[in-house]
Curated annotation (Swiss-Prot):
Subcellular location: Cytoplasm
UniProt: Fe cation binding residues: H111, H115, D304
Keywords noted in UniProt: Acyltransferase, Cytoplasm, Iron, Metal-binding, Transferase, tRNA processing
Residues bound to substrate: L134, V135, S136, G137, G138, D167, G180, N276
Name this protein carries in UniProt: tRNA N6-adenosine threonylcarbamoyltransferase
Family per similarity comment: Belongs to the KAE1 / TsaD family.
Organism ancestry: Bacteria, Pseudomonadati, Pseudomonadota, Gammaproteobacteria, Pseudomonadales
GO CC, one annotated term: cytoplasm
GO process terms (BP): tRNA threonylcarbamoyladenosine modification
Origin species: Pseudomonas entomophila (strain L48)
Protein function: Required for the formation of a threonylcarbamoyl group on adenosine at position 37 (t(6)A37) in tRNAs that read codons beginning with adenine. Is involved in the transfer of the threonylcarbamoyl moiety of threonylcarbamoyl-AMP (TC-AMP) to the N6 group of A37, together with TsaE and TsaB. TsaD likely plays a direct catalytic role in this reaction.
Gene designation per UniProt: tsaD
HAMAP family: TsaD
Length: 341
């Protein structure tokens, strides 16, 4: 089955072709970072308009790269949520219109299920069951995964997601958008031990997260340095390092608890923050200490992309899932509501 995948949940337009027998044939991505940087964050209306502009050229590009023609496509998968409604509607409308014109099925895919399954595109994919850490700008969740659509929420953030905390903290200390990669870059030049930030909610049982207080702690630290005339580039690096260390250690502690609670030894990390090198290294060390394994997608498939949507949609279509011809998207969509396959 050859599936065209379309991703438009936020500020990246992703298109890919995935074949159930041959694997990923082609993928293309256009990032709107430069468009939104001047505003310090994503402007939903601008994001939607740019998706309209980019979608069809990217579809033509992946068809050309894969050496395929439109008549060979068996189905279309598109992101139906969660995300920005206007942006989601661009992908959904395009998918349903093409599916109607080509007389093929279209299926809406859960954005976070796409992230969760992205490591399946690698040469050594994880086997079920496993624990997944979904960590992005909008989500921080620990999920037990027994199969596609078989999800048990173990814990999640009570306020800011980890990626959101990265971006907000970066903005507070004067870094450019997107802030997460900027903090990671500066942290490499940071002085270990100059600042020590708290590890929120690690001193109590459970698998819930909270990062809003950590963001406030970073702001107060930066303001104290600024009041003392010490708001220079090295201080930014030191604050970035302390913040990143706190987030990484908090996530690692909670992942270790989740693995112990479930009795599993396989951990998948997915979502944009899973590209963070410090997080990967910390989780690899933790899994090695318990003789377990950690899995993640290659960096370009950690952030939003069409390949993960094409793969996730293909699996559900192969399992017989169908969808009526209707344009429906959801800004909020708990993953536990998805049917198992």
């Amino acid at each position: 089955m050859l599936v065209l995948g379309l991703e438009t949940s936020c500020d990246e337009t992703g298109v890919a072709l995935y074949d159930s027998e041959r694997g990923l044939l082609a993928d293309a991505l256009f990032s709107q970072i430069d468009l939104h940087r001047v505003y310090g964050g994503v402007v939903p209306e601008l994001a939607s308009r740019d998706h309209v502009k980019r979608m069809l050229p990217l579809i033509r590009q992946v068809l050309q790269e894969a050496g395929c023609v439109a008549t060979e496509i068996d189905a279309i998968a598109y992101t139906a949520g969660p995300g920005l409604v206007g942006a989601l509607l661009v992908g959904a409308s395009c998918a349903q219109a093409l599916a109607f014109a080509w007389d093929i099925p279209a299926i809406g895919v859960h954005h976070m299920e796409g992230h969760l399954l992205a490591p399946m595109l690698e040469e050594q994919p994880p086997e079920f069951p496993f624990v997944a850490l979904l960590v992005s700008g909008g989500h921080t969740q620990l999920v037990r995964v027994d199969g596609i659509g078989q999800y048990e929420l173990l814990g999640e953030s009570l306020d800011d997601a980890a990626g959101e905390a990265f971006d907000k903290t970066a903005k507070l200390i004067g870094l450019n958008y997107p802030g997460g990669p900027e903090i990671a870059r500066l942290a490499e030049q940071g002085t270990p031990g100059r600042f020590v930030f708290p590890r929120p909610m690690t001193d109590r049982p459970g698998l819930q997260f909270s990062f809003s207080g950590l963001k406030t702690f970073a702001l107060n630290t930066w303001q104290q340095c600024r009041d003392a005339g010490d708001d220079n580039e090295q201080t930014r690096c030191d604050v970035s390092l302390a913040f990143q260390q706190a987030v990484v250690e908090t996530l690692t502690i909670k992942c270790k608890r989740a693995l112990k609670q479930t009795g599993l030894k396989r951990l998948v990390i997915a979502g944009g923050v899973s590209a963070n090198k410090a997080l990967r290294a910390s989780l690899e060390d933790m899994l090695a200490s318990i003789k377990g394994n950690v899995y993640y997608a290659r960096p370009r498939f950690c952030t939003d992309n069409g390949a993960m949507i094409a793969y996730a949609g293909c699996q559900r279509l192969l399992a017989g899932q169908q969808q009526d011809l209707a344009i429906s998207v959801q800004a909020r969509w708990p993953m536990e509501q998805l049917p198992p396959v």
